[in-house]
């Protein structure tokens, strides 16, 4: 039987969400039906559809009282809202149904594994986090009567019961279920623990998969763990990271570790580390394996240090997901590219080749806020490079966001300080990028309220939200020195 708290959330979502017009949302990026969203949850393929659940507060545009919102899609671009999947309606999750993942059971049902949050103590000040499950049919989910399935009694000594969250569950080829969960030691240094189960309901501690040892920030949130191109990959979102060059500048950052496990699959050793995204707004990524074998990732296109609430009350929603991205490992690094399904939504091609830029310039037909651009730049004179190239977009007389490249520094910077956002806010990030004989390739995707930049065929990415008024449709170029550019621009449309 569905709890009254969940029934109320479902009714509220449907009624209040209907008041938001499609024009007030991005075209392709998933936004909450109503209210607030942060982490993607339960990203999975089930019964012929992609399912995406999301951390949701339907009642306001700020974080509070986490529910699981729910959308489905057949192509990862057209999202249909389904009723709220879970509400904080049990004693063990009364202070929040936190993040988790999904797996299909042998009987065809889908199991959601999530973190339930309760409070203890005489003044209810201590937050306790445990792992719980719910089982359903893709629409309605019922919480297991034996929850929590992993209580704090199954934590090794010295690990935090207050920071013990975000289970990633999968089923191995031998039928064993495993999950990894983020936690930390008393000094808050991150630890990933691994559990195993025969039925996804009764769990035992298996190992400490990996310890941070204060190398990459502190607590590691939202772990994802999978095999890609013959390598074992761990994604996580560390808190309180310190910068390393231009990487990990967001405080709450994202980390990719590529390596291997031991023979018993109980311990992970990394060989390569990198930031997943070098922009401003990217957190808590989750992945799935598509039916055609692609590993696809989606993330919260926001950051805890840069939650700009400007205009959120009027829009009645806050937070959006990135475009889904296809992942590969190339040259020992994680590469990301927009899902190929987006190519089917390109129209109105405008192309220029060998354009000479020297100063400020606009090009006829190059404008818009829902566009997909492929840009290649190189110095006109290979013996003497230019000082700077800048792409300005979401531009009018008052506003603009810029993407600028300085070849002598090898840096690419995204900067939204003139986008209309409040001043006391994170505005810019830089990435150290490579050129191929002086040539830099960029793919820039704009979708009304965001920019996603894919550098050198996905070797690096930079992501940022921009809440600039949609009347700012301009795109222009500005250089210090002579730059030769090829550009192809497509409008993006939705049927």
Which stretches of residues belong to each language-model region?
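Beta-rich accessory regions
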Residues: 10-15, 255-281, 286-495
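Beta-rich carbohydrate-recognition and catalytic domains
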Residues: 1-166, 171-216, 229-278, 301-352, ...
């Amino acid at each position: 039987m569905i709890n009254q708290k969940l029934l109320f959330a479902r009714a509220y979502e449907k009624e209040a969400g209907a008041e938001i017009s499609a024009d007030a949302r991005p075209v392709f990026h998933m936004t909450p039906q109503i209210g607030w969203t942060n982490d993607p949850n339960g990203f999975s393929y089930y019964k012929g559809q992609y399912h995406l659940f999301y951390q949701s507060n339907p009642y306001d545009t700020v974080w509070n009282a986490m529910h699981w919102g729910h959308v489905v899609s057949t192509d990862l671009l057209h999202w249909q809202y389904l009723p709220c999947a879970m509400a904080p309606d049990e004693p063990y999750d009364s202070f929040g149904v936190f993040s988790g993942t999904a797996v299909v059971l042998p009987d065809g049902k889908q199991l959601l594994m999530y973190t339930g949050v309760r409070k203890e103590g005489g003044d209810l000040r201590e937050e306790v986090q445990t792992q719980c499950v719910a089982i359903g049919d893709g629409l309605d989910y019922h919480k297991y009567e034996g929850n929590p399935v992993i209580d704090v009694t199954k934590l090794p000594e010295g690990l935090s019961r207050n920071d013990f969250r975000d289970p990633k569950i999968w089923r191995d080829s031998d039928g064993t279920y495993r999950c990894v969960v983020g936690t930390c030691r008393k000094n808050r240094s991150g630890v990933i623990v691994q559990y195993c189960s025969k039925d996804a309901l009764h769990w035992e501690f298996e190992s400490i998969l990996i310890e941070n040892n204060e190398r990459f920030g502190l607590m590691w949130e939202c772990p994802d763990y999978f095999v890609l191109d013959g390598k074992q990959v761990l994604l996580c979102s560390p808190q309180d990271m310190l910068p390393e060059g231009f990487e990990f500048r967001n405080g709450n950052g994202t980390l990719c570790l590529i390596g291997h496990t031991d023979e018993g699959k109980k311990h992970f050793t990394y060989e390569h580390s990198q930031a997943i995204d070098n922009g401003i707004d990217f957190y808590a990524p989750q992945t799935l394996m598509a039916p055609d074998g692609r590993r696809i990732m989606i993330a919260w296109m926001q950051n805890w240090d840069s939650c700009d609430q400007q205009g959120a009350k009027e829009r009645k929603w806050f937070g959006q997901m990135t475009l889904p991205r296809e992942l590969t490992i190339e040259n020992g690094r994680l590469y990301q590219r927009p899902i190929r399904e987006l190519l089917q939504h390109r129209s109105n091609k405008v192309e220029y080749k060998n354009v000479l830029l020297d100063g400020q310039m606009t090009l006829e037909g190059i404008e818009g806020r829902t566009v997909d651009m492929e840009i290649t730049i190189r110095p006109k004179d290979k013996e003497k490079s230019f000082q700077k190239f800048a792409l300005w977009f979401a531009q009018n007389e008052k506003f603009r966001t810029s993407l600028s490249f300085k070849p002598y520094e090898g840096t690419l910077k995204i900067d939204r300080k003139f986008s209309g956002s409040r001043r006391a806010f994170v505005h810019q990030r830089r990435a150290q990028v490579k050129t191929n004989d002086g040539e830099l390739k960029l793919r820039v995707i704009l979708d009304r309220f965001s920019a996603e930049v894919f550098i050198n065929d996905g070797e690096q990415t930079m992501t940022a939200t921009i809440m600039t008024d949609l009347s700012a449709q301009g795109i222009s170029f500005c250089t210090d020195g002579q730059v030769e550019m090829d550009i192809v621009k497509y409008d993006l449309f939705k049927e």
